[in-house]
Amino acid sequence: MIVFNKIKAHKMVEDISLIIPSRDAEERLLQLLRCIPNWKMIPNEIIIIDSSDNKISIPKDFESFTKNLNIQLLIIHETNLYPGHARNIGISKSKNSILAFLDTSTFPTNKWLYSGFNLMKNNNSMGVWGNTYYQAKAFHSKIFRACTFGAKPIKTFPGSILNKSIFNICGLFIESVRAGEDGDWMSRAELQKIKMSPPNEFLSYDELDSSSLKQLIKKWFRNYKHTAKLPFFRAHKDYYYYGISLVAVLVAYN
């Protein structure tokens, strides 16, 4: 049972819209919601875009928590949405000029929102990128992490806090791809030279240990298959092509 009604009403609540896409991850979503009352700063709007086959059930005590702090809780249920499409819906429905983005696979520190919001304000920047650390304790997940994400936190879209007007410059997310739409959007922001602040806090991704090596590799190749369609990934494909070509030439002449 999640106990939200004991949270005091003097919590720091700011005009920020938190956007969370969720698909068939109700337990993970509830785990994320459990964290919110402990945050140093709490958004006054929480938008959950649920694209599961069955509607998620939000605990009554969480609804009471949002009412006690005058937080608007908006649950949008629409099936078969890719993450980019779900985020676009959240952006269009949000009422605030500052947007924060999370997903059900990453969990922030309690100071994440407070720190990012103040970095934007103090640096007069358009946003703060997410910074995600991929946890790995099992041997197979350490090997996979070493070959992919690395052992240090990396820049990610989940965890980003942005001025809403940035989407007038960079556009919205591509809605027709299963993965890679966030990287595509981040590349557009870099192309437009949007002023962003480096984050002080990081998020934790803890799903590597719960999957087998076969599952991790399968998911990785599935995501890269979808990402390969996007323009920003062209450079990656070129690196692979020239690298493989070089190896082929060396093998042929030895």
Residue ranges and their predicted role:
Residues 99:
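Short aromatic/hydrophobic "clamp" motif used to bind/position activated sugar donors
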Residues 34-43:
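Short, acidic, metal-binding catalytic loop of nucleotide-sugar glycosyltransferases
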Residues 134, 145-162, 178, 204, ...:
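A recurrent flexible, glycine/aromatic-enriched loop bordering the glycosyltransferase active site
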Residues 78-94:
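Glycine-rich, basic loop-to-helix element that forms the pyrophosphate-binding segment
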Residues 111-140:
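Conserved donor NDP-sugar-binding/catalytic core segment of glycosyltransferases
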Residues 44-54, 76-79:
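Short beta-strand/loop segment that forms part of the nucleotide-sugar
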